[in-house]
Amino acid sequence: MKGTFDVSRWETWFQLKERGTTWTTEILAGCTTFMTMVFILVVNPAILSDAGMDFNGVYVATVLVTLISTLIIALFGNFPFVIAPGMGINAFFAYSVVKAQGIPWQTALGSVFLAGTVFLVLALTRYRRFLLDAIPQSLKYAITAGTGLFICFVGLQNAKLVISSPDTLVTLGNLREPGTLLSIIGLAVTLLLMTYRIRGALFLGMIVTSVLAWIMGLMQLPSHFLSIPSGLAHTALQLDIDGVFNYDMLAVTFTFLLISVFETTGTMVSLAEQAGLMKEGRFPHSRSALLANAVGVTSGALLGTSPITTLVESGSGIAAGGRTGLTPIVTCILLVITMFFAPVAETLASTPFVTAPALVIVGFSMLEEMVHVEWKSFEEAFPSFLVMVTMPLTYSVSSAIGIGFIVYVLLKLFRGKAKEVHPALYFFALFFFIQLGFIHS
């Protein structure tokens, strides 16, 4: 078959034979990945609209940045990975930065853009190793686990399973309240689907919960199910970069950078191992993969969404046999179709009780990183513990990271192990000490 679509040429480009896969397998794998990650198209705009952003604008931005980043890593890296806005870091953006600190979402986008620009420089140079090596492994895992606790806490609040209390700060909500009861049922349904390993359990769980919400009178059906993509003008190029250059926002920017680099690097290595793409313990073509993520972070800020990351949900497509960039390309084709279903997505997201179960489960899934913390080493374990526990309790990911850095350095000094601390970590700890102790309000 010659012409624009030459099958043999594409088979050679994607190395189908070398990686022991076929067109059929790659297509099925792409569909599988789509089913497991499509919930993000609902949850990400739902979270960011809580911060005052336009839902439709974020929805279109989410799809576009996913397409841009994923096509780069698929075509130039030939990896079966999908890149999209990350769960957890979007909650940090909306609830910790914008709502808790009162920072305009436009300034938060400016912070994301600055973090993405630095990420891009790191991806193009060898300095990315400098940043990765500076942060202790235990703290890296603690940051991911703490973010999971944070997003789980947000989910419990949205479900009103946890509510504020003047006596105990928080308390158990009224389980007989219709919305709370709906979230409990939705969580149970989703867990049932996951128990039976149903692909797309999170998304299907939201669909079932939405139907129940409509039956209970908690949700109105959209007047139409399809629409021309719109709203991007409300979020694209709205970022405020000038407002980023103060101590508090630089701490936020540093946090965006850390989480983006750590999550991206860790997830890609894990997925590459699952797909059998590691060569002698090395991750081949890592630069192109990192560039795709860095470009995604910066373009996401320009379009109007929180930082992106390589999705762990890509593992479902790999488990289905996906081994090349064809897998995410199939996912991208399906994503283009979903762009026209914004009214349906907005309806699903309009009731926080519907998306709450997904947040709780996503948060839980991030806790598996806790097992990698060196719990038998006090100076490694205690700072990690503080990072995890202070994230949800302070509603601030950046403050929790700063506390972890400071305590880690102090404990190493107390133990006479100053040489074990990377020189850059001393600078990071001092930066957060000044920010938290003298500037943060």
UniProtKB/Swiss-Prot annotation:
Any coiled-coil regions, as ranges? none
Q: Which UniProt keywords apply?
A: Cell membrane, Membrane, Transmembrane, Transmembrane helix, Transport
What's the protein here called?
Answer: Nucleobase transporter PlAzg1
> Membrane-spanning residues where?
27-47, 63-83, 103-123, 143-163, 178-198, 201-221, 249-269, 289-309, 325-345, 347-367, 391-411, 421-441
Lipid bilayer topology: Multi-pass membrane protein
| Subcellular localization | Cell membrane
Gene Ontology MF annotations:
purine nucleobase transmembrane transporter activity
